[in-house]
């Protein structure tokens, strides 16, 4: 009570609740202390009874021990007599054993000398063994290093061979792409020059040029994309087996992407030219009065242009306005024209 600080109360109800709670707390503490006192009294009575029983047992044990002590005193007297008799006999035996001990010590000294000689020989053998083990470990380490170096060189040789194969394949594919690109550029120039006069005839010439370009020696068409583009780690720089730097790899990928976009644009132009030729032929057969078409030679029909009869945008035919180029390598490109093999890039 004296050590506790009485808080300030704002109302009589709070003060009443505080003192009531405090009284209940002290009442509970009093009840617990009284219970502990009762338990302590019961335990002390039980302990007193137990101690009295132990005292009775200790007194009985003391009487038994006194009887045993008296009996043991008689036994000690008898053992003293036996000990004196044994001492006389043991003295005789000790004299005999001393003679034997002197002889045994002489033999022991001889054996100690022999053991020292054996230990020296053993030390020499252990030193030789340690030297042999060290030399064997050194030889084994050098042998393992040589094996690892040979394995590393073999892996480098295998990697170099695979890189040489990849370089040759990439060179072949680059040559094929350059040939196809040159053929399509010539094809585009011829089509652009002759489109206003005879688009159908130009398309047929373009088909023949593409077929001629396909007859050139190139890499097989059936190669998949997974064989055409090796991983960045496998692309050599053409002067050694060291991999490309990140900037060179990015520039190479940009060049390949530009080539793919150009090829897609050329294919879209070819498809537009073919569609234009087919539409002109269908319009000639179904709308004979709108366009005056006649057969000029055996290469194909020649249709004069008419401003009111065409259904195509002028720029899409003469300018070969291509479709938007693909955003990446994985995007879809317009399908090739009929009769043409798809490019393996």
Swiss-Prot record:
The UniProt induction remark is:
Up-regulated during neurite outgrowth upon differentiation with NGF.
Q: What UniProt keywords apply to this chain's record, in alphabetical order?
A: Centromere, Chromosome, Coiled coil, Cytoplasm, Cytoskeleton, Developmental protein, Differentiation, Kinetochore, Lipoprotein, Microtubule, Neurogenesis, Palmitate, Phosphoprotein, Transport
| Disordered, as annotated region | 217-240, 314-345
| Modified residues annotated as Phosphothreonine in this record | 219, 245
- Give a Gene Ontology cellular component term annotated to this protein: kinetochore
The UniProt record lists lipidation (S-palmitoyl cysteine) at: 273
The modified positions for Phosphoserine read: 215, 231, 242, 344
State its location(s).
Answer: Cytoplasm, Cytoskeleton; Cytoplasm, Cytoskeleton, Microtubule organizing center, Centrosome; Chromosome, Centromere, Kinetochore; Cytoplasm, Cytoskeleton, Spindle
Q: Where is this region: Self-association?
A: 56-166
Write out the ranges of the annotated region (Interaction with NEFL): 191-345
Q: List every stretch annotated Interaction with YWHAE.
A: 189-256
Protein name, UniProt field: Nuclear distribution protein nudE-like 1
């Amino acid at each position: 009570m004296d050590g506790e600080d009485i808080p300030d109360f704002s109302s009589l109800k709070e003060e009443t609740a505080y003192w009531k709670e405090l009284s209940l707390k002290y009442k509970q503490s009093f009840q617990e202390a009284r219970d502990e006192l009762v338990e302590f009294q019961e335990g002390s009575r039980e302990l007193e009874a137990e101690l009295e029983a132990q005292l009775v047992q200790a007194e009985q044990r003391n009487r038994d021990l006194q009887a045993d002590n008296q009996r043991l005193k008689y036994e000690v007297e008898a053992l003293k007599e036996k000990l004196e008799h044994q001492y006389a006999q043991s003295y005789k035996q000790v004299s005999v054993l001393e003679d034997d001990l002197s002889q045994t010590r002489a033999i022991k000294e001889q054996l100690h000398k022999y053991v020292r000689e054996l230990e020296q020989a053993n030390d020499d053998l252990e030193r030789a063994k340690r030297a042999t083990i060290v030399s064997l470990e050194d030889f084994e380490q050098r042998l393992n290093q040589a094996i690892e170096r040979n394995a590393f060189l073999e892996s480098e040789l295998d990697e170099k061979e695979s890189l040489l194969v990849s370089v040759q394949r990439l060179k072949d594919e680059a040559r094929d792409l350059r040939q196809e690109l040159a053929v399509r550029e010539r094809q585009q120039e011829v089509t652009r020059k002759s489109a206003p006069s005879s688009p159908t005839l130009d398309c047929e010439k373009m088909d023949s040029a593409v077929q001629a370009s396909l007859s050139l020696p190139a890499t097989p068409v059936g190669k998949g994309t997974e064989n055409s583009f090796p991983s960045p780690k496998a692309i050599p720089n053409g002067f050694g087996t060291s991999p490309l730097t990140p900037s060179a790899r990015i520039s190479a990928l940009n060049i390949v992407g530009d080539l793919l976009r150009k090829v897609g644009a050329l294919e879209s132009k070819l498809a537009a030219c073919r569609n234009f030729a087919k539409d002109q032929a269908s319009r000639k057969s179904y709308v004979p009065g709108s366009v005056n078409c006649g057969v000029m030679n055996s290469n194909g029909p020649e249709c004069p242009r008419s401003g009111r009869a065409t259904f195509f945008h002028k720029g899409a035919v003469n300018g070969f306005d291509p479709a938007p180029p693909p955003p990446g390598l994985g995007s879809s490109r317009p399908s090739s024209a009929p009769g043409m093999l798809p490019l393996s890039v």
